[in-house]
Curated annotation (Swiss-Prot):
It comes from the Bacteria. Catalyzes the condensation of (S)-aspartate-beta-semialdehyde [(S)-ASA] and pyruvate to 4-hydroxy-tetrahydrodipicolinate (HTPA). The record marks T50, Y113 as: Part of a proton relay during catalysis. It catalyses: L-aspartate 4-semialdehyde + pyruvate = (2S,4S)-4-hydroxy-2,3,4,5-tetrahydrodipicolinate + H2O + H(+). It comes from Histophilus somni (strain 129Pt). The lineage of its organism: Bacteria, Pseudomonadati, Pseudomonadota, Gammaproteobacteria, Pasteurellales. Keywords: Amino-acid biosynthesis, Cytoplasm, Diaminopimelate biosynthesis, Lyase, Lysine biosynthesis, Schiff base. Belongs to the DapA family. This is 4-hydroxy-tetrahydrodipicolinate synthase. GO terms for biological process: diaminopimelate biosynthetic process; lysine biosynthetic process via diaminopimelate. The gene is dapA. GO terms for cellular component: cytosol. It is an enzyme of class 4 (lyase).
Length: 298
């Protein structure tokens, strides 16, 4: 049970980036999404992370979207900026552009495609942290990046003052204990896998950076509040209701299904994504509809 609240905790949305039918960021829809999360009790928002299609936005678009998210939030909810890149220089540029923005933290993914060694990952994150005072959250998602940031390396990185936590998306709940052992109990562990998020909180994790939260924000916030209070049986009831969503929102590559689900629920006016991502296939749509019904959202 968490007896005090760390800097980042609870149900944190990996926010989708709404687009209009010209493929441009829809800032009116974005404003409505921010309000939805504030009203629903979401504990923080990640702007332009993986789910926010950071890889297909330019640096200028990334920064503008983050700044608009901050503007819409108006201090009512912490905003974490997705600033990761597979080039260290690009990640540093993004981070520096936000130094005086008021973001609560930066989420920085393990460099993808070029497959750095553990030493390379250490040097990458160290260089980013040294260019800013903004708290840094590491992001490990080997299924996308091709590289696994090991607990031993996380332990080394935790010695850098403004590297405060990790989004761990391997789905391996044993990582909670391993990372806490290497980095210390105060190092923030946030699950990046909805399916095992509650289990990781039972083992000492402080929250979930969630895809499901985009469309079931109130339920995810309540589940995490119960878990943080040690009321795991009650939290499990909510998690059971969302279990099909946790799974089926990955029936095609994220964020394809969750963006379509948000459209189906009227949270965004269009399910449009930028190429090479395409809208959810017709054959997958009934499964998402069933999952939404099982969760009581339709």
């Amino acid at each position: 049970m968490t007896t005090h609240r760390p800097l980042f905790y609870g149900s944190i949305t990996a926010l989708i980036t709404p687009m209009n039918n010209h493929g441009e960021v829809d800032f009116n829809a974005l404003k409505k999404l921010v309000e939805y999360h504030i009203v629903s009790g979401t504990h923080a928002i990640v702007s332009v992370g993986t789910t926010g299609e950071s890889a297909t936005l330019s640096i200028a678009e990334n920064v503008k979207t983050i700044l608009k998210t901050l503007e819409f939030a108006d201090g009512r909810i912490p905003i974490i900026a997705g600033t990761g890149a597979n080039a260290t220089s690009e990640a540093i540029t993004m981070t520096k552009l936000l130094n005086d923005s008021g973001v609560a933290g930066c989420l920085s993914v393990v460099p993808y495609y070029n497959k750095p060694t553990q030493e390379g990952m250490y040097q990458h994150f160290k260089a980013i942290a040294e260019c800013t005072d903004i708290p840094q959250i590491l992001y490990n998602v080997p299924s996308r990046t091709g590289s696994d940031l090991l607990p031993e390396t996380v332990g080394r990185l935790s010695q850098i003052a403004n590297i405060v936590g990790i989004k761990e998306a391997t789905g391996d709940v044993s990582r909670v204990a391993k990372i806490k052992q290497m980095a210390g109990e105060d190092f923030i562990f946030l699950s990046g896998d909805d399916a095992t998020g509650l289990e990781s909180m039972k083992l000492g994790g402080q929250g979930v950076i969630s895809v499901t939260n985009n469309i079931a924000a109130a339920d995810m916030a309540k589940m995490c509040e119960l878990a943080l209070a040690g009321k795991f049986d009650e939290a499990e009831i909510i998690n059971d209701k969302l279990r099909a969503l946790h799974k089926d929102l990955f029936i095609e590559s994220n964020p394809i299904p969750v963006k379509w689900a948000a459209y189906k629920l009227g949270l965004v006016p269009d399910p449009i994504l930028r190429l090479p991502l395409t809208t959810l296939s017709e054959q997958a749509q009934p499964k998402i509809i069933n999952a939404l019904k099982n969760a009581g959202l339709l």
